[in-house]
Amino acid sequence: MHLSDITHPNQLRNLNLSQLRSLARQIRDKHLQTAANSPVGCHLGPGLGVVELTLALYKTLDLDRDKVIWDVGHQAYAHKMLTGRYHNFHTLRQKGGISGYLKRSESRFDHFGAGHASTSISAALGMAIARDRRGDNFKVVAIIGDGALTGGMAYEAINHAGHLPKTNLMVVLNDNGMSISPNVGAIPRYLNRLRLSPPVQFLADSLEEQLKNLPLLGSSLSPEIDRLKETVKLVTAVQNNKAGIIFEELGFTYVGPVDGHNLAELLDAFELAHGISGPVLVHVATVKGKGYPPAEAEQVGYHAQSRFDLATGKPYPPTKPKPPSYSKVFGHALCKLAERDPRIIGITAAMDTGTGLDKLKEKLPDQFVDVGIAEQHAVTLAAGMACEGMRPVVAIYSTFLQRAYDQIIHDVCIQKLPVFFCLDRAGVVGADGPTHQGMYDIAYLRCIPEMVLMAPKDEAELQRMVVTGIQYTQGPIAMRYPRGSGVGVPLAEEGWEPLPIGKAEVLRSGGEVLILAYGSMVHPSLQAAEILKEHGISATVVNARFAKPLDTELILPLAEQSRLVVTVEEGCLMGGFGSAVAEALLDADLAVPLLRLGVPDVWVEHATPEESLAELGLNSAGIAERIRAKFQARVLKGSPAELPTVNS
């Protein structure tokens, strides 16, 4: 059977091992071809590692009834191909195409949406409890990676499920020893030992089956068989120090470890697990990047890939050289400062490469901490370090810091501890879509008393803000910066001067319009001012630098002299930078027209950052056009002949 003929996953139920193996090869080929030619890039290693797992599990289920909950979603590319999306798979992560993650609105087989890790067991348990309350009878399976198992939420769910012995729930642990980077901590170390141990549950259940088949005696031996099974598991555990006793103690029946690339073993394991009452965990050992040697050899680099040569595995060089990314500039600056100050500690939540802290990890490993996928712990860990005079720097994507909101307020801000939050991927993130957009940090941090918020206009100013954040000791301070390359300004190797807290700068003086731009929107606003000049509108452009405290000493006099005030931010309008300016104008009783440009009350779907910004009207042409329209309607009271439409 050809993969393109699969329109429903239940078609797998009638296939033999040979046909399943053929499908596995086709799935990997399709995944690799899509990744190698994708204009936006896609995740690679995780999906290649779960092909056999997906095929075997789906063969044992009735997916018209049963529900599979995938953790995160970039494991689920085989799932997408098997659930009616094969012919659209080439559009993966592109504007108008299929999502790179699970999405309930995209397919009836995507039972729970996810982009952040460690949520699957909680969601699956909720569905299982609802099923039992209604008296339904379908299977619920959560598939979680060992990286996601470093997140505390997974253990909260396991703890709950383990106390519900009559609730049938299967958890499949996809254990490849990695999240994006190699996993850290005691739990991954324990799982690594388990990967090498014999299949304990198979041994115990095989013994049970043989004893029960003894003539005359078998049916009367049930209590003794149970005790013998436990003895077998315990003896195996003692001999190998690797059996899944921790999961058994938490109330789960443990099955495994199973070879995640052996379809026959997987089918046996899943059939066995389906017959076990109560919570059961099937431990499947997989190889990230399986079937593509470059991805198996370099598992961190091939977690996700932009376009590459399939024959060699090497990425295609960019058409023209790009400036260094904000993440790299940040990592370099922090490393330079840490070399001179041993109090500086860089903290990440399983994202050392993505945040630029890999440089610190390499050069100064004693000043680097990776806590795993545990953002809550990362923030309170930093709070504890700050109590003891260290200078903790928490580098986390904007979207992931949301997971530690209580810790930010309760453990850091109330105690006025000098923790420096560095929010990477702030603003639109592109192909990852709504689960990863960094739209909300300005709003959710600005409302916290005494929190300082800053954003650089370019990579050179970012260097100065790193120094500013390190030297600020009066309490918490946060810096946000976008995904991708800087604007290409010259960079000094060191000697960066700190910025005065709460002070903005005027970059361009005009007269009629005052544009207050924050962070990544400064350069598009400068370009918009040039466009407006061509159409007879003069504009002052201010680099706000700080959303809190706002530089009212600079802003209010300029606003009073202007006919229109405009705020521009790459974040949500509700509660954001524009709201801060609106509050300041109201408090000062300044009745000047105000236009706030930013992200409205919508979910921003996956697309390239450029496509998203254009759609939101946050590129230079869009900013200029919206200012022109507002100026014409509210200030000039309508005179279209004077102001031609700006071409976007």
Swiss-Prot record:
This entry carries the following GO cellular component terms, namely: cytosol
The alphabetized list of GO BP terms reads: 1-deoxy-D-xylulose 5-phosphate biosynthetic process; isopentenyl diphosphate biosynthetic process, methylerythritol 4-phosphate pathway; terpenoid biosynthetic process; thiamine biosynthetic process
Binding site residues for Mg(2+): D146, N176
Per the record, the pathway is:
Metabolic intermediate biosynthesis; 1-deoxy-D-xylulose 5-phosphate biosynthesis; 1-deoxy-D-xylulose 5-phosphate from D-glyceraldehyde 3-phosphate and pyruvate: step 1/1
Q: What is its EC number?
A: 2.2.1.7
Q: Which cofactor does it need?
A: Mg(2+); thiamine diphosphate
Please write the reaction equations for the catalytic activity of this protein: D-glyceraldehyde 3-phosphate + pyruvate + H(+) = 1-deoxy-D-xylulose 5-phosphate + CO2
Q: Which UniProt keywords apply?
A: Isoprene biosynthesis, Magnesium, Metal-binding, Thiamine biosynthesis, Thiamine pyrophosphate, Transferase
What Pfam family is a match, any one? Transketolase_C
- Residue positions annotated to bind thiamine diphosphate are H74, G115, H116, A117, G147, A148, N176, Y292, E375
Keyword Metal-binding assigned: yes
* GO MF annotation list: 1-deoxy-D-xylulose-5-phosphate synthase activity; magnesium ion binding; thiamine pyrophosphate binding
Give disulfide pairs as residue numbers: none
Asked whether the keyword Lipid metabolism is assigned, the reply is no
Q: How is the cofactor bound?
A: Binds 1 Mg(2+) ion per subunit. Binds 1 thiamine pyrophosphate per subunit.
Looking up PANTHER family in the UniProt record yields: 1-D-DEOXYXYLULOSE 5-PHOSPHATE SYNTHASE-RELATED, 1-DEOXY-D-XYLULOSE-5-PHOSPHATE SYNTHASE, CHLOROPLASTIC
Q: Which family does it belong to?
A: Belongs to the transketolase family. DXPS subfamily.
Quaternary structure, from the entry: Homodimer.
Known function: Catalyzes the acyloin condensation reaction between C atoms 2 and 3 of pyruvate and glyceraldehyde 3-phosphate to yield 1-deoxy-D-xylulose-5-phosphate (DXP).
Q: What is this protein called?
A: 1-deoxy-D-xylulose-5-phosphate synthase
